[in-house]
Every structure is written in structure tokens, then in C-alpha cells.
Design a protein with these regions (language model features):
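Cleavable N-terminal signal peptides
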Residues: 10, 20-23
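Positively charged n-region of N-terminal signal peptides that target proteins for export
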Residues: 1-6
């Protein structure tokens, strides 16, 4: 009887010790976030006309990040990647230059990333999210194409799921 009870306890505890660290506690960071162009600053410019980022948590705990942008001249673009938020560089498709990003969580809703272009460190971004979870500010600093970058990008949550309202 003791053996059966011990085996049952072990079976119940296995999921608690084997769950993916990224799979728990980051639900408030997911959803569709739309850039408020008027409240944002981007140096060097110009600012995009439209930009949105969709963060979708996948079953294995990783996060799919999709960014859609319409630049100042009206050209559209789509960037996509999946990150485990473990600080390791991962490929990003659709970017104007070959790039990777390494994401990591700072807490339940905030994160930072390091971007590399053609193997060289480019920019670092860090988010802060309002207490009500409706506004995310992304500060990006570094160098791109030989120019200093300093962006303060203000995003407003449009949806808590992966589809816009």
C-alpha cells in the first residue's frame, strides 16, 4: 500500500518539476500591442505609419512574436520569430537585414532583448508595462547601420489574445 501511495505522489509531482519555466506566469505579456506613433520617439526617424506586435504563448512555453509595420513611405513588412526567452540568440525572419534576437524575462510582464545584425551586436531593448497592463513602453538603444539609435516606443494593448479587435 505504501508503494502505491508513494508512486501516486511521485506521478502527481512530476509535472510540477518538469514544466517549462517560460510556460508559467507570463500571460499578461501576451496579446496584440499597437504602437502609439504620436507618443513614441524614434531617433533616427522617420517613425512608421503603423506598427503592431503580437505575442502568442506556445504550448512548449516559448513565445511567437510577430511584428507588422507600415513604414513612413507606405511599404509594409512582417517580421516573425519564436523565442524561449532564455537569453539565447534566435533567428528573426522578415527583417531588412539578417538578424537574431535574444529575449529574456525581467519579471512576469517585462522583458529585454539584445539584437544582432550579421553577427554584430546592434541594439538592446527593455520594456516597462503599466500597472493596469494596458501600456507597454519599449526603450531601444544602440547602433544600426552606423547610426546611434534611441527609441522610446509606446504600445497600447488591443487584445489579450493573438488576434486584433
Amino acid at each position: 500500500m505504501r508503494t502505491i501511495s508513494a508512486a501516486l505522489v511521485a506521478l502527481l509531482l512530476i509535472p510540477a518539476f518538469t514544466s517549462t519555466p517560460g510556460a508559467q506566469g507570463h500571460e499578461r505579456a501576451m496579446g496584440v500591442w499597437v504602437l502609439n506613433v504620436e507618443k513614441s520617439t524614434m531617433q533616427p526617424g522617420p517613425k512608421p505609419k503603423l506598427q503592431s506586435s503580437t505575442f502568442t504563448q506556445l504550448p512548449d512555453g516559448s513565445v511567437k512574436i510577430e511584428t507588422d509595420v507600415t513604414d513612413a513611405s507606405g511599404q509594409t513588412g512582417h517580421r516573425e520569430m519564436v523565442s524561449r526567452f532564455d537569453g539565447k540568440q534566435e533567428a528573426r525572419s522578415g527583417a531588412p537585414q539578417p538578424s537574431t534576437r535574444a529575449y529574456r524575462w525581467l519579471d512576469e510582464v517585462n522583458f529585454e532583448f539584445e539584437e544582432m545584425i550579421s553577427g554584430q551586436r546592434s541594439v538592446i531593448g527593455r520594456t516597462t508595462t503599466s500597472k493596469d497592463g494596458k501600456v507597454r513602453t519599449l526603450t531601444v538603444n544602440g547602433m544600426r547601420n552606423g547610426q546611434p539609435v534611441h527609441n522610446v516606443e509606446v504600445y497600447e494593448r488591443q487584445s489579450t489574445s493573438g488576434t486584433p479587435r
